[in-house]
Amino acid sequence: MPISIPKGEKLMDLLSMKGKVTIVTGASGPRGMGIEAARGIAEMGGNVALTYAGRKEGGEKNAAALEKEYGIKAKAYKLDVANYESCCQLVKDVIADFGQIDAFVANAGKTADSGVLDGEISAFEEVIQTDLLGVAYCAKAVGHHFKERQTGSFVITASMSGHIANFPQEQTSYNVAKAGCIHMARSLANEWRDFARVNSISPGYIDTGLSDFVDKETQKLWHSMIPMGRDGDAKELKAAYVYFCSDASTYTTGSDLVIDGGYCAR
């Protein structure tokens, strides 16, 4: 059966996440795309399950802060996205605690700090395992639940690096993984067409702290190639996550939204 037209008429009703449960992976940091995606969902009244890899304190702190500020239910869970069984356990635990899963934001990821020739093969494999296979594991783990309920939205944090090859830093593994994420979203959108939507978001250079190790001269070079001349702030992405997770996008699937200050258009 085709995915149905939403009952809401007003925009705020379509964007509302009240009564819905969203998993957001990689949301334990003090700032970043994961916590901003979760905050956007919470602002619209949705309950959220946050995941962390090693920062338990950060995940639990973020969950508690969202509960206090927005009056929603939030809980933090440990997740190793590179392990399929861990992804399956997450889905089981969230269903047990919240009763259902309506949307899943596959945001957890890892950056690359070397190219193919100057880096270890283990480093290349780790990025692919986390950024590409980890997304596939999450999709498979939650996809059965979506199919059973005949509803769901799966949102992948891809990257503009899936569209272009970044310069001057060498990060082939990351570029390959994110390009795969974009095409995974398109492919899953077709595979899941009868019961769930799948889309991706491709951020550009966003000030999340993950690139703080890059020297200032390189960062200045990045800015010179961005038409808007600056990094993005993670809060400038949260509306996109809400759109894809909510009923406002029920006729949108297989799409990739580039939010990069114009970098890919230069």
UniProtKB/Swiss-Prot annotation:
The active site is at residues 159, 174, 178. It catalyses: D-mannitol + NADP(+) = D-fructose + NADPH + H(+). Liamocins have high bioactivity against the pathogenic bacteria Streptococcus spp. and can be potential new specific inhibitors of oral streptococcal biofilms without affecting normal oral microflora. Liamocins are also able to inhibit human cancer cell lines such as breast cancer cell lines T47D and SK-BR3 or the cervical cancer cell line HeLa. Disruption phenotype: Affects the ability to produce liamocins with a mannitol headgroup. It holds the Pfam family adh_short_C2. Keywords: NADP, Oxidoreductase. Its EC number is 1.1.1.138. It is an enzyme of class 1 (oxidoreductase). Transmembrane segments: none annotated. One of its GO terms (molecular function) is oxidoreductase activity, acting on the CH-OH group of donors, NAD or NADP as acceptor. Induction: Expression is regulated by the cAMP-PKA and HOG1 signaling pathways via the transcriptional activator MSN2. The keyword Repeat does not apply. NADP(+) binds at residues 107, 140, 174, 178, 206, 208. Homotetramer. Belongs to the short-chain dehydrogenases/reductases (SDR) family. Catalyzes the interconversion between D-mannitol and D-fructose. Plays a key role in liamocins biosynthesis by providing the mannitol moity that is linked to 3,5-dihydroxydecanoic acid (provided by the HR-PKS PKS1) via ester bond formation catalyzed by the esterase EST1. This is NADP-dependent mannitol dehydrogenase. It comes from Aureobasidium melanogenum (Aureobasidium pullulans var. melanogenum).
